[in-house]
Amino acid sequence: MKDYEYQPLSPGEIRLLRLEAARPDQPLSGSILHHRLRNPVYHPRAEDDGGGYLEHALAYEAISYHWGSDQRTPFHVVIDNGSVIRITASLHTVLRRLALPDGPRVLWADAICINQVTSADNREKGEQIQLMPDIYRIASRVQVYLGPEADDLALALDFIRSIADYSEYLDASQHDDGETATALAQQRGFVLPPVGDPRWTALRAFLRRPWFRRVWIIQEFVYATDVAVTCGDHDVDWHLLWLCAKAYADNRQLIYTGYSPDLFGTRRLDLFREAHEGARGMLVVTDLRMRAWGYMTPAYMILSLNEKRDKENFSGLSIRKDLNTIKDYERFARAKLLHDRAEGETFPFGRPDMLQLLRRTSNFLATQPVDRLYALLGLTGTDHIKPVYSEQQTLNVVATKFAAHFITKGSMSEVLSTAGIRSATPSPNDPPSWVPNWTKMTYSQDMQIGFNRLADIQDEKNADRDKGGEKPAEGGETTSDEARAKDIDRLYSASGDLPQSFHINEIEASLTVKVTPIDRVVLVLPGKLCLGIPMYLGMTQKLGPVYPNGQPIEEAFWRTLIGNRTWNGLPVPDRYAVQYENLKRHESNLLTRAMLLLAIAALIALPFVTIAIRCIPFTGHVGLVTAAVAWKVSTVSGVVLPGIVYLILLPLFRWLWVTALVPLLVVIAWYLMVKVYPLLFLDALKYLGVTTAASIGSVPQDCTEYLSSFMVMGNRHNLAFTESRLMGLLPLLTKEGDIVAIVHGCHAPFVMRPTRRQGYYKLVGECYVHGVMNGELAASESIDIALC
C-alpha cells in the first residue's frame, strides 16, 4: 500500500488519529481528522465532586512516549483511503495498548499527526511545535507510556511505593544533616533492603527508563490536565513517582547502596549514575507540574501545616508533603485548575524561567540537539523566538540567538558564567565562546552553581528580604548562617557597582564588553583538585607566608579551595578552619598510603622491567617505543626524544650488572616523574585515591561541611596562580598565558584567551580568584574587548 499523503493544515489546526476498534490479532486502522483547537468549556457543579468538568468540542487523548533509539518503521496504521502511515515499534506498542476492543478512540501522537517528512523546510513541524502546549492542555487526558514490562517491574514498583511512603524522611534535602535521613525513616518503619537485594537492581533499571529524560515529555506532562501513566501492564500513580524521586535524588544511601568500584572502566558507576539521573529527570518533570498546580504556594502551605510538628525532632516536616496531603490539595484546587485550563492559563503562579529550565534540564536528551532548546519554549512563553527547522537555522545560529536574547534582557552574568571554549583545540565550526553549550548532556551530579549564579541567588534572597518575603527560621529566630548571610550585600561582587556595558555584533557573532584586566596566568596545577590537600598546600606555600591581601597563606589557601563559601552558597563560618585541619589530616594519611602502594608497585614491577630489558629483542623494544609514542604523542610534548634516548641507552642497560641496573632504573624513573613529566605524574597520582573529595560513600564526620564545599569544586576546576602571586580556581581548559579579567556588571572574574586578532578574545570560563571577589580591583583601569 502507498504512503499516506498529508493534506495541508489551516492556521490553528491539528491532525488527530481516529483509531478504530481492534483486537490483538487485527491490524491497526483508522482515519486522520483535521481539528481546530478550541479551549474547552468549564462547567462547575454545586456538589463536591472534584470541582466540575471540562466540555471539549472533540475529546481526544494525547500520547506521551519515548520514540526509542530504533527509528525504523516496520509497522503501519492503515488509513481509510487504503494508504498507510508507517510507525516505529515503540509507537506500535503504545497504539496496541490504547486500541479499544469495542469502539474507536481519538488520539494525538506526534509521529502520526505532524507531517515531519514532506512539509516544505519542516515549516509545519515548527508551527505544530508552537501548538503543542495547547495540544496537551486541551486534551481530555494525556496517556503516558513508560515502556514495556521488563527488569522485575512489579518489584520496582513495590519498592517505589515503599520509598514514597517515607519520602518526607528520606529526602535528605529537608534535613540539616543529610546523613540522618535514612535513619529517621528507619525509626518510623522504613526497611532499607540489604546489599544484593533484587529490589535495588529492579528500582535502578526502572529509573533508567528513557522516558524520564526525554526533553519533549516535560511540556507534555506539565500541560496535561489529567494524566494516566502506564508501564507494561501496570497503572502507575505519578504522585508516587514524584515522592520517590524527591527521596532518591538527594539521599546518598539510596543512590549508592550496593555500589562497588569497577575494576576496569566505569560501566558499573555509569549504571548507578544513569539511575540517579532518571530520578532527577522524574523530579524535574513532576515538580514543574506540581508547582503549576500551586504546590508550595501560601494556600498549599496553610492547608498542609503539620499539626504534629512539635512532636518531630527535626524541622523538615513543618509543611507536609506526603501522598494524602498532595491529593487533598489537588482536590481543593481542582476547580480553579479546570477554570484556568478552560481560559488557556497553565501557569497562574508564574512561568518557569528559561535560563533556570536550561540548568535544571541539562541531563535531558533529544534526538536533534536543537530540540534541547525548542522543547522548552512552550513552558516559558518566550514568544519572540520561534522553532524553525531549516538548513540556515543551524544549532550554532539558534544557540547564539538564545544567548543574545538573554543578554539583552539583563542576564549577561549568568550567560557568560556557563559559556566558554568547548575543547583545548577549538574548531572553526564551534559557536562563539560567549554562547553556552546548552545542548551538551551534563549529569546533574556534575553540574554546579557557578560563582556568578551564587551571587545572583544572594541578590534574589536580599530582594525578597527587602520586600518582607523572607521567613524566619523555625521558632522565630534566624540561624547563625542566615544571620551571616544578611550581614553582606552579595556573596561575590568583583565588579562592584559597575554597570553592564556590551554590544552584540550579529554579523560576526561577537560580544563587546567592558572589562578590568587583573593578571596573567603563569601556572596551572594538574589534578582537577583531586591530588589531596597536602600536595596542593606544599605547592602553594612556595608563594611565601603571606598572601597579597595580608592573610596567612594557608588561610587564603583553604578559603580558595572552597571558593570562600559553604556548599550551599553562604559565607564561610569560623568552624570551617577546624574542619579544614581535620580534612588535611585525613588526606595526609591517604597520601601516605598512596605513596606506599606506589612504592610496592614499583618494587613488584622492577624485576619484570629488568627481565624485559635483557630478554626482549631490540626490535621488540623499538615496537614498544613506537606504540608508546603513537599513543601519547597527542597529549605529552617531547615524548619522542625520551624514546630515542631509551633505545640508544638500551645496549648499556643490557651490559650493566643487575646490581647496577636496578638503582639506575630507579634514578631514571624518579627523574622522569619529577623533572620531565611532573604534571603528567601528578595527574596520574589522583587515581590512587589521595583525596576524600573523590569519595562516593560516607565521609568523615569531623569535616563534613568543609568537605562538602570542597567536593563541589573537585573535578571542575584547577588550582592556578598569576604573575602577582594571586591564586584561584580556574576552568579546566585554562592555560599559562591566559588573562583573568573582571567583566563589568558580573559578580565573578573570567578567564580569557587572546586571539591573533587584536582586541579579540576567546572566553575560557568564569573563575574564583582569592582577594579580588569583593570589588578590590573594580576601580582599576578598564578596556573594551570583543569576545568571539
Task: Put a short name on every predicted segment.
Residues M1-D25, S29-G30, R38-E47, G51-E61, ...:
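Acidic/Ser/Thr/Pro-rich low-complexity tail/linker regions in eukaryotic proteins
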Residues R38-W108, C113-N122:
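Fold-level signal for large, globular catalytic cores of enzyme and receptor domains
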Residues R86-A89, E127-L131:
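A general alpha-helical scaffold signature found inside nucleotide-binding enzyme cores
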Residues A139-S140, T225:
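Short, well-ordered alpha-helix to beta-strand connector turns
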Residues I63, P101-K125, Y136, V142-L146, ...:
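Short acidic catalytic loops
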